[in-house]
Amino acid sequence: MERAESSSTEPAKAIKPIDRKSVHQICSGQVVLSLSTAVKELVENSLDAGATNIDLKLKDYGVDLIEVSDNGCGVEEENFEGLTLKHHTSKIQEFADLTQVETFGFRGEALSSLCALSDVTISTCHASAKVGTRLMFDHNGKIIQKTPYPRPRGTTVSVQQLFSTLPVRHKEFQRNIKKEYAKMVQVLHAYCIISAGIRVSCTNQLGQGKRQPVVCTGGSPSIKENIGSVFGQKQLQSLIPFVQLPPSDSVCEEYGLSCSDALHNLFYISGFISQCTHGVGRSSTDRQFFFINRRPCDPAKVCRLVNEVYHMYNRHQYPFVVLNISVDSECVDINVTPDKRQILLQEEKLLLAVLKTSLIGMFDSDVNKLNVSQQPLLDVEGNLIKMHAADLEKPMVEKQDQSPSLRTGEEKKDVSISRLREAFSLRHTTENKPHSPKTPEPRRSPLGQKRGMLSSSTSGAISDKGVLRPQKEAVSSSHGPSDPTDRAEVEKDSGHGSTSVDSEGFSIPDTGSHCSSEYAASSPGDRGSQEHVDSQEKAPKTDDSFSDVDCHSNQEDTGCKFRVLPQPTNLATPNTKRFKKEEILSSSDICQKLVNTQDMSASQVDVAVKINKKVVPLDFSMSSLAKRIKQLHHEAQQSEGEQNYRKFRAKICPGENQAAEDELRKEISKTMFAEMEIIGQFNLGFIITKLNEDIFIVDQHATDEKYNFEMLQQHTVLQGQRLIAPQTLNLTAVNEAVLIENLEIFRKNGFDFVIDENAPVTERAKLISLPTSKNWTFGPQDVDELIFMLSDSPGVMCRPSRVKQMFASRACRKSVMIGTALNTSEMKKLITHMGEMDHPWNCPHGRPTMRHIANLGVISQN
């Protein structure tokens, strides 16, 4: 308290400006955040200088040296002093110039920030200079050495020991250099693709070894050829050019746009995207590049829309995307983030509408193409169909006019998908029409025969009182499923009782249950009439008006007359579960029970009994009583406060699965599973356990499946099948480096490679063995997925998604099944295994393994 008073009486500290050196260091750390940012700034400077040849050299992935050389215009001598000073630039002069800026850089912060974070040396030669100049700068951006340096026109910037002035960041940078390097190459790929007519190359040197090329483009004026230079010609074969279409009315309505908005041609989109055929996409989003006015950026909404539309046609893969969005510079704000990759757009909804309509149109036309295989085909009888080259070259439109017969392969060898869809839609519409009872069926299946037998037998079993009309109220196949087996299967899956309600309102009770009437239902057309069927138990018949029933007991002097209560006219309500024998009594049973009750009451007589009571004095103190009451009240409040804190509040329902899992992860540790007490097994599928006052239910199959799955993940070494000839992989230099560094992980997954150190980069690794397991086969696409996973977490044991699916299938088959009776030791073993798992809360297929049922303390309190 005294400290607080003394601090409040101290005079407020004066507000003073931070010294320029500290400001420079603080702000520089916010401009250059990573290796990719540093390389990006240097490459953009070269592009802004009009270079046609950019060469990037790295040492030890960029830890020791980053050097970018270009053949641009160079720097004039009068600009040497301001070259690395904060907010010194030749791109803009005032804020209004931002709306018209066409260069990558405009803030004048990049070189100044690099000087603050590393040792920077620049050599440059302008066209007007006779000889080049080499400049060395201090951390404040001041020139400390200036010497003549012979070189051709252009500029070379060398950055040594990046982040050396920030010890913590420098240590983190060195520790994660592989991940930083992979991100840098991803960023560099974007500039290689979009820089038409510019040759870009990158090499990396490890220690004193030779330089290894990372990426290289040939300076082609075409973006398509740049894609081939970076990712190989195989990638080009799976791409289709982007075709822009005006937004459709339905898409405009989805985005809340009017028809007049759709007429504005604000955007022009060009580029390439993967075909939607399964197998040509990617297993991840590692090759998606977006540009706005040829500036690489990360438009989150555009990226999400492209992937969502692609998943409508190929839900298991991601597309390769290169899209450039051209728009008036006045509609764009690029001054949002330090790296300029977050860009704000006017009329963004219109862009999304154009993009969605165009993608749907492209993929629809791609899906409707039927590729004709060159392999020999078989007709219905199994004979070979000879395919002529002239027939294969015929367009689809011509072939639609030919005979519709598919049996004669000579006359028609190609069918339009649209005609197939039309045929299938006609088939489904005819099948879904309700059949008339009088319409004969030419081919009745066994199921249809059963349904017909059920209709006839049901009609015959009903009495002749006009209870059920044959055409309207009989159970037939035209009014939904009525097969007893079908009905039983539906009820078994739904988990309801055995009474089923037909579409006409009839209730069919379980044959095992006993009720007073076999059918009690009202017709939809006449709800006032009542139908009665003979009782299975041969109970006495009651009059339709529910008249009085005279019941006589065995004793002559005692008689009783009772009125039977009217029963509901329709027992087949949707809530009807099951008929039980003891719930419905006949009138004679009711009469007999009441007579017995009267006999018992008549025989009971009250007798007065005199009891001698003893009087004992008792010490009593009002103060002690009040004290005890106060103490009990305090204890009750304390216990109530403890009970109010409930560890588990989530319900057992699919909507709260995530909340329940979070609660379990928070409150249950791995050691607690061994402390749980086994209560028993429920329904041959669940284990009931107790931990302190909490009761849990555990899915015996799901928990055993997850344990087996994790054991397979950790310890299984897949056996590989050697290939007849080594297979060349279409890998980039970065992906090839990741593969070589993680060969042991690939071998544990069943892949094996031969590495040729003397071969050119991107061709050093060749696949010689693939994992095989019964009916599971794997290929190069699984190698790509594993490389992508290892790029984010190098050295960590990873499994491709298809290997995980195989392990999940195996774990499911070898686990304890639902319906298996377990003894206490077996149940204890399953619960103990949960404490040995990394993620015990879900099975490999996503089903929950454990849920909280109740707290005994809360139940006893209530």
From Swiss-Prot:
Record InterPro entries: DNA_mismatch_repair_CS, DNA_mismatch_S5_2-like, HATPase_C_sf, MutL/Mlh/PMS, MutL/Mlh/Pms-like, MutL_C, MutL_C_dimsub, MutL_C_regsub
Modification Phosphothreonine, positions: 573, 597
A single GO molecular function term of this UniProt record: ATP-dependent DNA damage sensor activity
SMART domains linked to this entry: DNA_mis_repair (SM01340), MutL_C (SM00853)
Quaternary data: Heterodimer of PMS2 and MLH1 (MutL alpha); this interaction is required for the stability of both partners. Forms a ternary complex with MutS alpha (MSH2-MSH6) or MutS beta (MSH2-MSH3). Part of the BRCA1-associated genome surveillance complex (BASC), which contains BRCA1, MSH2, MSH6, MLH1, ATM, BLM, PMS2 and the RAD50-MRE11-NBS1 protein complex. This association could be a dynamic process changing throughout the cell cycle and within subnuclear domains. Interacts with MTMR15/FAN1.
Record's protein name: Mismatch repair endonuclease PMS2
Native source organism of the sequence: Homo sapiens
Biased composition (Basic and acidic residues): 391-401, 408-444, 484-495, 528-552
Cited CDD domains: HATPase_MutL-MLH-PMS-like (cd16926), MutL_Trans_hPMS_2_like (cd03484)
Manganese found in the keyword field: no
Result for mutant: residue 488 to V: In MMRCS4; uncertain significance; normal DNA mismatch repair activity
Consequence when changing residue 128 to L: In LYNCH4; uncertain significance
Effect of residue 263 to V: In MMRCS4 and LYNCH4; uncertain significance; normal DNA mismatch repair activity
GO biological process per UniProt: mismatch repair; positive regulation of isotype switching to IgA isotypes; positive regulation of isotype switching to IgG isotypes; response to xenobiotic stimulus; somatic hypermutation of immunoglobulin genes; somatic recombination of immunoglobulin gene segments
Result after altering residue 815 to L: In MMRCS4; decreased DNA mismatch repair activity
Main EC class the enzyme belongs to: hydrolase
Chain sites annotated for binding ATP: 45, 70, 109-111
